[in-house]
């Protein structure tokens, strides 16, 4: 199944930024999720028509719809936490608030503005807090409509939670059949991403592969750590999977060294790394026997019959530091997969902090997140103003479904869902198409059980659309909601017409009240994020090129890397490297988000692109130098490294204070730092060229 992408001719008809907004991402259909979506929504609808209790079935379907729209996959317990928290602390209280303010006029207007502010504050607590805040707002607003009139009031929340429980029940069989499949898949994806990145070395796709690897590592650590936390202990299988994941840091360092030198690896090597991923995915673990040092074990490979092939270690194909480090990583991973490893002996755990201490630390952390900064509070103000304008319009204008106007404003302005402008455009276009589709369905399909057929199709397409484009989500979500609401108030195609009018008005409110008057909304936010990434790179440089070699020399008399134990947990250097690459990945994501803005904003963002690329080259050069030092090359002087980091930190300070960056004196000429110095020089040449652009808060020209 493929949803059509925006044709190439669109770019010649509409502005480039608009073509980017409309173009869907590539994604494979998630068949399992699509099937669960049908069952989660279709079964309550079938019960509604069979029993005549339309209101209870609607609430159950609403609970299922929440689960479908916020389920982003991953480990079972992570999904349960996300869905249950959003339902119990967001959706259900929201419905109760809606029933309390239903029909109360200006009191309801004030209440929904307050809820919008609370929703924005909750979004600062991270992923689960973000979706919980959004559901609180959505279901409070839905309570202003027909849902708020349902009595008794507790039926509303109870029916909704039953739908959530039904949706959670649908994802449970997969967990019971294979409890660790999500974690194994996440770790396997890291090795698939490594193989893809090595294939793309020296090509334009190399940067995207680096970003994909950073994302895969983040997802894998989240999955494995969540599994360990839910298991309540360090089981042997969990520790083994963590050891497999830890080896990926050795692969990542070797890959960065190869990227920095532009050295490619033979296809056989990347094929074997793919086979490592297959071995992890199929749990070819300690009982599988020794994996092949030059011989195959197992039956056909991927796509063949029998057991999957197990990887072998190819002979040395190059004597470069990067190639040797990559082969050593393959040897270590083979030992971990074959069971020839032992968990590192950890010192006795210190006495755990008291409950009072833990509660105090948690309270401080949450308080810091909630306080935020100026931009965060400005956004909360924008959301509350737009919600207030929409709520006032819903009171004074003769709208058939006035609560939809408020609801759409909140969804478009969701603080951490990307470009507000792009979402307004996508929402508008998607709702036009979706409203027409809903009108056609209501006009052609007779009311009754026959509606189950289009309802099931729309429910199946919703998860697929979610993976591709926000506008596509609205194409299928709009008629879906129209059909659900029509269960309570049979209005036919006029319901779709009202939905269209409300969405157009909401998009206008967002663009005219919540976007155009606020300079921070249409300015590129790349400078501050770039400065933060510069500091993360400097922290990695100082640890990897100064502190780590010094510690090795003090301990062994040599800066050479000691032989790593297979599955050894990553040290501070690896954690700082991962943090820096994650920051670079987030910087790229912010750049892509800004490119979806109109030309006045995206043009300023484009000017930052050479600096982003140059900073990625600095990271690769540092990692390549680290690998070379570990193989016995000369250690750079600490003073030279500190000179480079001082220069980069001064540039970060200049960017944050909107002043032209100044380079004090020449860069160090240490031969051991030649590649790093050249990469830093590239960053400086981009940032200091027409430095007034930086002082004006836009971008390097």
Outline where the language-model segments fall.
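Alpha-helical transmembrane segments and their membrane-interface boundaries
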Residues: 1-136, 140-170, 302, 317-475, ...
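Cytosolic/matrix-facing juxtamembrane and C-terminal tails of multi-pass cellular membrane proteins
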Residues: 479-485, 503-508, 524-554, 565-579, ...
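Hydrophobic core segments of alpha-helical transmembrane domains
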Residues: 72, 116-119, 161-201, 506-519, ...
